[in-house]
């Protein structure tokens, strides 16, 4: 079994097993040096709809072999029991652990009625079954706009929140289109994209409006935290290998 936040050493034919998810919807498995996979538009993610990226643009199947970018032979240490699971945990704690999703007002925010604006900031929304990597459709009491006249298709991005004709909302995700004609009432800040990605069907979302300065500060803090985590993991691994004469 593979526990969260641990560094483990594996040998050929070892089987890794994960327990059921407790928090979130997705787990991340990293290997030393990274996987040697096909990149598409600068990403190693797999787009199943157009069969691009990742491993031949498809889901992984039993017996698939993913090559590594960097091969390291730790076999001399694998016989030592204490080397199988290294005695330290990656610290992924982050000061900003709120469950709220911060949003910047979109171009058409002011087209919402006063009541709809209040509902957006005070009512929880629910991720519905009609959700995928292109977008999350949300279950909510219908919101309404004063007017949608004069709208033309405009640029959208990861985290754009659009108001659909039935008053429901959709939050665009990683595989979003590039333009959209529905009102863009808001944009989820970049630092909270990962929170969105961990939501699953039935999960609630609480939105809160913020400003550009706060969004930039949170993104900077997040990037610094991830860089520190990466450097700490590299340092601890090198330190452990040196200690064992490798």
Give the positions of each predicted feature:
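Conserved "landmark" site that anchors the functional core of diverse proteins
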Residues: 1-246
């Amino acid at each position: 079994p593979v526990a969260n936040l641990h560094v483990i050493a594996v040998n050929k034919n070892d089987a890794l097993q994960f327990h059921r998810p407790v928090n979130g919807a997705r787990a991340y498995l990293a290997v030393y040096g990274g996987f040697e996979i096909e990149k598409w538009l600068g990403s190693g993610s797999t787009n199943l709809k157009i069969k691009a990226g990742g491993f031949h643009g498809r889901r992984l199947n039993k017996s698939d072999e993913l090559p590594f970018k960097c091969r390291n032979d730790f076999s001399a240490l694998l016989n030592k029991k204490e080397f199988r699971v290294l005695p330290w945990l990656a610290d992924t704690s982050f000061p900003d652990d709120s469950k709220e999703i911060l949003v910047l007002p979109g171009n058409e925010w002011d087209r919402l009625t006063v009541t709809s604006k209040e509902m957006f900031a005070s009512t929880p929304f629910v991720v519905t079954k009609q959700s995928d990597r292109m977008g999350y459709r949300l279950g909510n009491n219908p919101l309404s706009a004063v007017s949608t006249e004069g709208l033309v298709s405009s640029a959208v991005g990861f985290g754009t929140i659009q108001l659909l004709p039935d008053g429901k909302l959709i939050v665009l995700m990683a595989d979003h289109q590039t333009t959209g004609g529905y009102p863009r009432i808001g944009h989820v800040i970049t630092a909270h994209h990962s929170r969105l990605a961990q939501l699953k069907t039935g999960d609630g979302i609480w939105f809160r409006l913020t400003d550009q300065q706060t969004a930039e500060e949170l993104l900077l803090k997040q990037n610094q935290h991830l860089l520190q985590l990466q450097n700490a993991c590299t340092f601890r691994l090198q330190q452990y290998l040196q200690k064992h004469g490798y």
